[in-house]
A protein has these predicted regions:
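Helix-to-loop junction immediately C-terminal to a conserved catalytic motif
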Residues: 12, 17-49
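Catalytic core of membrane glycerolipid acyltransferases/transacylases, capturing the structured
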Residues: 39-97
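Glycine-rich, highly charged phosphate/nucleotide-binding loops
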Residues: 25-31, 99-106
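Short amphipathic alpha-helical face segments that pack within enzyme cores
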Residues: 23, 54-57, 139-143
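Short, flexible loop segments at the rims of nucleotide/cofactor-binding pockets, characterized by
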Residues: 19-26, 94-99, 131-132
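Alpha-helical membrane-targeting segments
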Residues: 1-26, 80-89
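Soluble or luminal CAZymes and related metallo-dependent hydrolases
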Residues: 10-14, 98-103, 136
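Non-catalytic C-terminal accessory region of glycerolipid acyltransferases
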Residues: 2-3, 104-216
Length: 216
């Protein structure tokens, strides 16, 4: 497991230079919902994972919307390819290693800090944003079990892109708060209901015939 090593100067570099430079590839980034964030509780943010840019988008969400300190679980191969990520709050997980338990324990432990937002991509890898469903790989249940006495909020995030009249894509990020049972199967079901709702909202942006909009 590669642990994060937050560095104030590197974090400043991320916020003022690297994040804007990476996210310049979007025409705009729009947060489509407001969420009520409790300052005395940590946050778990679950999002779909479709590109390398997701991490920088997650940092912006954490910084501007949640106003928390970022911790993000990242596939170990990506951490090795981009070792600078550890200075921004990222730590590794390897699905084919015994160190996976160390990563899950570290994630559960981080939720004890109310200043933290823990970002997890439940798909466990990069997948097309055009999938009809988001699958959850094992691991969340372990985190919930080892953080069962810790008060923390759970948020769902869905990022969808459209070009429409723009030269570069517009990223629309939809959010909702999850108040249900801390059960990974029920959470996966709830996430997919929200995911379908977000896709439906995105499809209706330019008022197409209702017959071509996906049914939820």
């Amino acid at each position: 497991m590669i642990k994060d090593k937050p560095n104030r100067l590197m974090k400043l570099f991320l916020n003022v230079a690297l994040e804007p430079w990476i996210l310049r590839h979007y025409s705009s980034i729009k947060f489509m919902n407001e969420i009520a964030v409790k300052p005395d509780q940590s946050c778990l943010m679950l999002m779909n994972h479709y590109s390398f840019n997701d991490g920088f988008l997650l940092n912006r969400i954490c910084r501007l919307l949640l106003k928390k300190q970022l911790k993000a679980m990242v596939i170990e191969s990506q951490m090795k390819a981009f070792p600078i990520l550890k200075y921004f709050g990222c730590f590794s997980v390897s699905k084919k290693s015994r160190s996976m338990i160390d990563s899950l324990n570290y994630a559960a432990e981080s939720l004890k800090d109310p200043t933290v937002m823990l970002g997890i991509y439940p798909q466990g890898g990069l997948y097309s944003m055009h999938l009809n469903k988001i699958h959850f790989v094992p691991g969340l249940a372990y985190i919930f079990k080892h953080a069962k006495n810790v008060p923390f909020q759970v948020f769902f995030g869905v990022t969808l892109l459209d070009y429409l009249e723009n030269y570069k894509p517009v990223a629309r990020v939809y959010f909702t708060s999850y108040e249900g049972e801390r059960d990974s199967n029920k959470m996966e079901e709830a996430y997919n209901l929200f995911y379908q709702s977000c896709k439906q909202q995105n499809q209706r942006l330019y008022r197409p015939p209702e017959s071509v909009v996906d049914a939820v």
